[in-house]
């Protein structure tokens, strides 16, 4: 009996030290309507630049007094920068019909345009609105299209509370960003 307890004690300690089983939420872009007359057939989407709180794996929301707090027991299922970049590429592909891919560009022939997105804010505000703000730049390595930089200030309602509502709001905000980029190109 003592021998069995001696063997089980280290196993119990290892189980207690195991990783937590936090809920993980996917980053996606809601589907949207197609944009006609896009001059670019190929789009390289560079890794989205995020502020440190938005690049962390924890999902954050604004609390009383304006401070940002991690929503307990909830994390993004993917690295937020990579997840937002992939969602934006999927959204652009669906909206434009252009071949949109995350950097590095996977084909031998270079892309018609490169999209660089820099996010200033990405969080669920205390007033029930999700804010996604920053700027995007479209560059043309071969000079085939006009290059430009545009700000974006996207506000979408957060329907409900908690991390799933914040994840849904981010999805809709990314879909709106894909729409704005598509129309600008």
Predicted regions mapped to residue ranges:
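Short secondary-structure boundary motifs at beta->alpha junctions and helix caps
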Residues: 67-77, 142-183
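Sec-dependent bacterial lipoprotein signal peptides
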Residues: 1-17
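Surface-exposed short loop/turn segments
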Residues: 18-36, 90, 95-142, 159-160
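Soluble periplasmic/extracytoplasmic beta-strand elements of cell-envelope proteins
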Residues: 42-48, 60, 114-118, 131-137, ...
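A structural "domain/chain start" motif
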Residues: 17-80
């Amino acid at each position: 009996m003592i021998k069995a307890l001696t063997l089980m004690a280290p196993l119990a300690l290892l189980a207690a030290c195991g990783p937590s089983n936090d809920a993980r939420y996917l980053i996606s872009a809601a589907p949207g309507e197609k944009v006609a007359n896009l001059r670019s057939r190929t789009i390289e989407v560079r890794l989205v630049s995020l502020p440190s709180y938005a690049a962390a794996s924890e999902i954050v929301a604004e609390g009383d007094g304006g401070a940002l707090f991690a929503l307990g027991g909830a994390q993004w299922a993917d690295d937020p920068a990579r997840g937002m970049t992939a969602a934006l590429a999927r959204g652009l592909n669906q909206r434009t019909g252009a071949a949109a891919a995350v950097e590095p560009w996977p084909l031998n022939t270079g892309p018609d345009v490169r999209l660089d997105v820099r996010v200033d804010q990405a969080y669920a505000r205390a007033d029930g609105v999700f804010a996604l703000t920053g700027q995007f730049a479209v560059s043309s390595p071969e000079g085939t299209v006009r290059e430009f930089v545009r700000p974006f200030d996207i506000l979408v309602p957060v329907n409900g509370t908690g991390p799933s509502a914040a994840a849904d709001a981010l999805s809709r905000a990314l879909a709106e960003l894909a729409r704005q980029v598509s129309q600008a190109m």
